[in-house]
UniProtKB/Swiss-Prot annotation:
Gene for this chain: USV1
Keywords carried by this UniProt record: DNA-binding, Metal-binding, Nucleus, Phosphoprotein, Repeat, Transcription, Transcription regulation, Zinc, Zinc-finger
Source species: Saccharomyces cerevisiae (strain ATCC 204508 / S288c)
PROSITE patterns: ZINC_FINGER_C2H2_1 (PS00028), ZINC_FINGER_C2H2_2 (PS50157)
MF terms in GO: DNA-binding transcription factor activity, RNA polymerase II-specific; RNA polymerase II cis-regulatory region sequence-specific DNA binding; sequence-specific DNA binding; zinc ion binding
Renumbered zinc finger spans (C2H2-type): 41-66, 72-95
GO annotation terms (biological process): cellular response to salt stress; regulation of transcription by RNA polymerase II
Start and end residues of each stretch annotated as Disordered: 1-37, 91-149, 326-374
Gene Ontology cellular component terms for the protein in this record: nucleus
Name of the featured protein: Nutrient and stress factor 1
Lineage, broadest ranks: Eukaryota, Fungi, Dikarya, Ascomycota, Saccharomycotina
Amino acid sequence: MENTTNRNTAGVLTSSNGNFATNSVAASTPKRSKSARRKTFKCTGYDGCTMSFTRAEHLARHIRKHTGEKPFQCPACLKFFSRVDNLKQHRESVHAHKNHHSTSSHQRKPSSSSLSSSSSASSSSSASSSTSYSDPYRKTNINSGNMPMMAENEKAPQIIHSSPEFITSTRSIPPISPRSIYNTQRQQQHQQQQHQQAPYYFPSHPITDSYYQYPLPSNNNTINYLPSVDVQYPLNVSPSSTSHPASEVIISSFPPRSMPSTSFKYKDSADFQARTTMNKYNIRPSNINVNTSNINNHLDSFSPPFSPSTTVAEAKPIILPQYQQAFSQPPNGNKNNNMSSSKNGGKGGENFKNTDDRNDNNNKKRSETLSESDISVNTNKKRLSVDYILT
């Protein structure tokens, strides 16, 4: 024990032994301590400070105390420190302790008593809500005697006023999620695209009503209000032939304001040739006589107003059934006019004269005898009631 406590005395007591020299040397030359080390780094420049350090980083750390510099910052609380060890100690003592308590509180499971209290509270709240929604005019009353019996952490229940029926009905509807709204919008857009992309087939030719039903004419003396009629005959077929089927009658615009333009399907047809010859010889309606005798003989057809000669057979276009009534009723003055026209004409079956002088004389006589009830042909080309094209 004495050897360990006091080396000097131990060396003296053991001097009789042979090991005296070694013990005395060990006692005289002890190990070099930190304080006994050589301190080469001294603090200079600051009055009253005479400290010295063995390492340069220790001197720099000491100088920060004089300057007040704190380069080390805590990332959690943004607090600055002058030494790294102080920052490390701060984080371990302050922030690590807080994190440990927060994680332990999250991991702690609720006790059975808390679960029972929460279930009872939820059942009471559901019962109160059901009673409040069942009767719209009922209110829950709270007894003042039961107030002290409640726990301190529980809040006093509020008086629940019942809402009107229309509000309760809207509350019972489940909330609409954004996904359901998105799905409904997608369905609506898809339906709209299907409606827009529905195939629409255009007809190969425009739909036209070639047999437009005009109103039937009244028992008026004039016949100028009738629609114009275009007669079309087949290719290279005589209109007087009985073997061929009846020709088509196409009703054009009502009423014509000017000379109607005739369209021909084939240039070599009979009606096209007749029109070209009429245009070539400049035949006017004033130079053509109207045969009114055939109207009385054949009530279901008209005689053609334009005929190049008496030898050519007359064309008898077929009138549609809805127009037969209008053409079957002759005007009032047809008989007198026919008699006068037959007297002026000389012979009953003769319609035209071969010479221009006879045509002029006949026109002068017939212009006085024809009345308004006959089929009138306007010479000024403003209005033409019925147009017949003959070969």
